[in-house]
Design a protein with these regions (language model features):
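Helix-to-loop junction immediately C-terminal to a conserved catalytic motif
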Residues: 56
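Catalytic Walker B motif of ABC-type/P-loop ATPase nucleotide-binding domains
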Residues: 167-170
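Conserved ABC ATPase signature
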Residues: 142-146, 150-152
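Conserved ABC transporter NBD signature motif
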Residues: 64-72
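Short coil-to-helix segment of the ABC ATPase nucleotide-binding domain corresponding to the Q-loop/switch region
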Residues: 102-110
């Protein structure tokens, strides 16, 4: 069974002034299988952010359905949405979203604190994750004391510590330099190889070339998709670049 199923999702906004209707998503349908690493790409205004907000249960579609591990997100009570999100989804953001008044360790623990876990349970979960991500020596430091790449590794640890069914990454390399980007993409690959499902929205061809599948959104619809198959990162990079050129020049779906 798919870990994520998106079926006919449409999102229509009404503008504040004038009451005009804006269709951000027309009819988006796709599925993500357990253990997949999927990238979503598209030009600004294509609907990527709207789609991610709906998948994260931060917004609701005008029509259509989203299922996470068979659970219809529209059937979750408002009072349970935050708990469902915390227990089932891990988030990695462009700007890290770490609290400067908390140590790196406490930032990572935060979802488990909210879930009422004991310190012993939190420590047991953190140790192997911190070792894998190479942040054990940083745990007592504060976000303002570490580099951007180290902050993002802390954010990845926070996403992993709840054992999420799906990690949603929103432009995770956007605020990183080239070296930190390479390191994060290497870590994402390692995490994915352990069976973790990842869905990443990105403008970066380099980041997308590490995924096993790339979906392209244009004018609120899935326009095209590429599968890695046996291709190298370099070969997929070129195919992604060619597809983005086609998108920009108004090419036809293929």
């Amino acid at each position: 069974m798919s870990i994520l199923k998106v079926s006919g999702v449409q999102k229509v906004y009404t503008t504040r002034f004038g009451g005009n209707k804006v269709e951000a998503l027309k009819s988006v349908s796709f599925e993500v299988e357990p253990g997949e690493y999927v990238a979503i790409m598209g030009e600004s205004g294509s609907g990527k952010t709207t789609l991610l907000n709906i998948l994260a249960a931060l917004d609701k579609p005008t029509s259509g359905k989203v299922f996470l591990d068979g659970k219809d997100l529209s059937q979750i009570r408002e009072s349970q949405v935050a708990t469902f999100r915390r227990d089932n989804l891990g988030f990695v953001f462009q700007e890290f979203n770490l609290l400067d008044t908390f140590s790196m360790e406490d930032n990572i623990y935060l979802p488990l604190v909210l879930a009422g876990k004991s310190y012993g349970e939190m420590r047991k979960r953190l140790e192997p994750i911190a070792e894998k991500l190479g942040i054990t020596e940083l745990l007592k430091k504060y976000p303002y004391e570490v580099s951007g790449g180290q902050k993002q590794r802390g954010a990845v640890a926070r996403a992993l510590i709840t054992n999420p069914k799906l990690i949603l990454a929103d432009e995770p390399t956007g605020a990183l330099d080239s070296k930190a980007t390479d390191e994060l993409l290497r870590l994402f690959g390692e995490i994915n190889r352990t069976g973790q499902t990842i869905l990443m929205v990105t403008h970066s061809v380099k980041a997308a070339s590490h995924a096993s599948r790339v979906l392209f959104i244009k004018d609120g619809e899935v326009f095209h998709q590429l599968y890695r198959g046996e291709r190298t990162n370099e070969q997929l990079y070129q195919m992604i670049s060619d597809t983005l050129t086609m998108l920009a020049t108004g090419g036809e779906r293929r």
